[in-house]
């Protein structure tokens, strides 16, 4: 949905939500993800799994849509789907990652989520 929301604003379209968007998710800017992966390669322990996310990005899908719409100068519209369409929806309400192990390696996130979304949208506009 993240990519679809950005595609909507890049195409000068409103974001259409087909649920209340109350599910919480963790997100991560690609540069931060790459930085974390390198940090894990250099300082991580072999065989240990590390979560990568931006704790400042722990927002609901609705909040994500509103932030992206605001950056793109668009609106968020709600469309109630029929029962058949909702059968494919993810029922997980909260999917937030713990960064305890990654932070114990000394990795830190830089910048804020809104600025990173703004940067992503600007880069994509310029590449069109």
Pin down the residues of each PLM region:
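C-terminal lobe/hinge of AMP-binding adenylation domains
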Residues: 20-21, 98
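Conserved C-terminal active-site "lid" loop/helix of NAD(P)H-dependent oxidoreductases
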Residues: 30, 62-63, 85-109
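Non-catalytic, hydrophobic alpha-helical segments
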Residues: 33, 37, 52, 64, ...
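Amphipathic terminal alpha-helices
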Residues: 113-128
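Mid/C-terminal beta-alpha module of Rossmann-like enzyme folds, strongest
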Residues: 43-87
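Glycine/proline-rich active-site loop of Rossmann-fold NAD(P)-dependent oxidoreductases
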Residues: 1-4, 13, 18, 30-31, ...
């Amino acid at each position: 949905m993240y990519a679809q929301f950005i595609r909507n604003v890049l195409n000068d379209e409103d974001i259409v939500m087909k649920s209340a968007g109350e599910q919480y998710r963790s997100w991560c800017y690609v540069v931060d993800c790459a930085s974390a992966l390198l940090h894990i390669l250099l300082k991580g322990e072999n065989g240990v799994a590390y979560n990568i996310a931006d704790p400042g990005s722990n927002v609901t899908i609705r909040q994500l849509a509103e932030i992206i719409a605001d950056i793109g100068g668009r609106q968020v519209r709600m469309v109630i789907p029929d029962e058949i369409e909702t059968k494919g929806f993810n029922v997980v309400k909260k999917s937030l990652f713990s960064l305890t192990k990654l932070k114990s390696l000394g990795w830190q996130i830089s910048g804020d989520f809104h600025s990173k979304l703004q940067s992503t949208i600007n880069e994509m506009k310029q590449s069109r």
